[in-house]
């Protein structure tokens, strides 16, 4: 890409297991673009199989950024993600590149695309400990009471984001929803959505692949290294494997529960992304999905001069 062209950004989003990573690599190879992750769990080191983190071999094909940024014991907020992503995007654009932002964490993507701003409130370990002692169901009920918009947006089982929203409220006295402000970037952005009418089958296939690739062993290693009370171990997939290791789920029930919870999460993602009318959708099952994506990008580049 010539440096005289304007900076821009391509976003590839959609529900989990739709095939974003493989399509992103194919697009990036054709465009010479770097891939920037927009996944809230890929920022953590050692959480690999259960997060479907691109493998080392995949990462060698195309430069990947915004992964393995911090220790799993650290708190990493959307604001922290912005602090990493915004200057990185600018640096890549200044080098004449067209970055490809890829992921399914809607709030991360919205933070970049809409320029959402977040309160810089430091983690409060004592407050978090007190809230955790109440249990996730009560914490989420409290969030629904003090900040209904955030309560609707944050999944009932998402302990990390529930605690963060409550932390912001109790420390600042303001609702997280009210504190968010939008300052959209000046450069043009193309958002491409990837979805499939066979998503359930894809979820089942990927779950089985994770389990045969050593997911249970990964979780056991994480428990041994960080302790079974690590908040990230209470997230999708890891929570179910922990239950299996503790004896409350059988081997046959394990994949069933992972698939069930993943389907619910995918439904939530679809609702989030489908609410954005600016996203242009591609069928993940279409044989020409790469050509379709490249066509959208080419038309975007011509119209915007990027």
Curated annotation (Swiss-Prot):
Which UniProt key words apply to this protein? Answer: ATP-binding, Magnesium, Nucleotide-binding, Transferase, tRNA processing
Enumerate the SUPFAM superfamilies for this protein. Answer: P-loop containing nucleoside triphosphate hydrolases
Binding positions for substrate? 16-21
**What biological processes does GO assign it?**
tRNA modification
Binding positions for ATP? 14-21
List the InterPro entries. Answer: Dimethylallyltransferase, IPT, P-loop_NTPase
> What cofactor is needed?
Mg(2+)
| NCBIfam families, sorted | miaA
Q: How does it assemble?
A: Monomer.
Q: What is this protein called?
A: tRNA dimethylallyltransferase
Q: Which organism is it from?
A: Synechococcus elongatus (strain ATCC 33912 / PCC 7942 / FACHB-805) (Anacystis nidulans R2)
